[in-house]
């Protein structure tokens, strides 16, 4: 579409010569058309809506026979940070929230190219943390690479499990010295049916294992006499 601008032309006035009188009836109207330009913001928005992600699958040796699949953009829900839920800025999480997060994470996990023990060439992504609720206990796993048991502190405050980790590194040479400190922490609301004074923790090869035993529920049976 084009927009039209209409106006009437009149004679120019010169300071050296007297201007002739021109009546408004003798003015000749004409029109000028300008092409309408599409705003760049609309075009950019259209490109973003039609953008796609390209995922490469089935890569073989020597980069032979690779296929690509077009997928719409979607937000990844899996946390891939080294400590998983150990985020100092995250709010306190409950056990049920962790279990729900694990369910969503495993539903969204995709097989990736690699080697596994079976030799099939496809392996699953390892989550940086895991939690399992069994019949008599709750088991947790947190990946803490580079930390020793002296760097990790676990405590129970009221009904909240507190996990803190801190790692200090000092780098020095002939001309420069520096120190880096990394701290992590999380607070987990424990369920009511657990024995807080019998929680066990073990750190092996940068992996923290926590076992929380559940309280034994004794079922009381009462016989009702029939009259």
Swiss-Prot record:
InterPro entries: A-crystallin/Hsp20_dom, HSP20-like_chaperone, HSP21-like. Residues 120-227 form the sHSP domain. GO terms for cellular component: chloroplast nucleoid; protein folding chaperone complex. Induction: Highly induced in roots, stems, leaves, flowers and siliques after a heat shock at 30 degrees Celsius. Highly and quickly induced by heat stress during early seedling development. The keyword Chloroplast applies. It holds the Pfam family HSP20. Disruption phenotype: Ivory phenotype seedling under heat stress (30 degrees Celsius). Decrease in transcript levels of class I genes, but enhanced expression of class III genes (e.g. accD, rpoB and clpP) after heat shock. Residues 14-34, 56-65 have a biased composition (Low complexity). It is found in: Plastid, Chloroplast stroma, Chloroplast nucleoid. Its main location: plastid. Confined to pollen grains of budding flowers. Chaperone protein required for seedling and chloroplast development under heat stress, probably by maintaining plastid-encoded RNA polymerase (PEP)-dependent transcription. Forms oligomeric structures: dodecameric arrangement of two trimer- of-dimer disks stabilized by the C-terminal tails, possibly through tail-to-tail interactions between the disks. Interacts with PTAC5; the formed complex associates with the plastid-encoded RNA polymerase (PEP) complex not only during transcription initiation, but also during elongation and termination, and with a stronger efficiency in illuminated chloroplasts. Binds to promoter regions of PEP-dependent genes. This is Heat shock protein 21, chloroplastic. It comes from Arabidopsis thaliana (Mouse-ear cress).
């Amino acid at each position: 579409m084009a927009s039209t601008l209409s106006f009437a032309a009149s004679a120019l006035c010169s300071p050296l010569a007297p201007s002739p009188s021109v009546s408004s009836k003798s003015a000749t109207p004409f029109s000028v058309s300008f092409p309408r330009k599409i705003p760049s913001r609309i075009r950019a928005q259209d490109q973003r809506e039609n953008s796609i992600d390209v995922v490469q699958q089935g890569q073989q040796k020597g980069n032979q026979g690779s296929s690509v699949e077009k997928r719409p953009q979607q937000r990844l829900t899996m946390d891939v940070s080294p400590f998983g839920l150990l985020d100092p800025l995250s709010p306190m999480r409950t056990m049920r929230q962790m279990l729900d997060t694990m369910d969503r994470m495993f539903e969204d996990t995709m097989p990736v190219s690699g080697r596994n023990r079976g030799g099939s060439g496809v392996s699953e992504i390892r989550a940086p943390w895991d939690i399992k609720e069994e019949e008599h206990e709750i088991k947790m796993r947190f990946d803490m690479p580079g930390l020793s048991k002296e760097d990790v502190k676990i405590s129970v405050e009221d009904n909240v499990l507190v996990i803190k980790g801190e790692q200090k590194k000092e780098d020095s040479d002939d001309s420069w010295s520096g120190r880096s400190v990394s701290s992590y922490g999380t607070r987990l609301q424990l369920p009511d049916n657990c024995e807080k004074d019998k929680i066990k923790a073990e750190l092996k090869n940068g992996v923290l294992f926590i076992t929380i035993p559940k309280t034994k529920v004794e079922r009381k049976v009462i016989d009702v006499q029939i009259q």
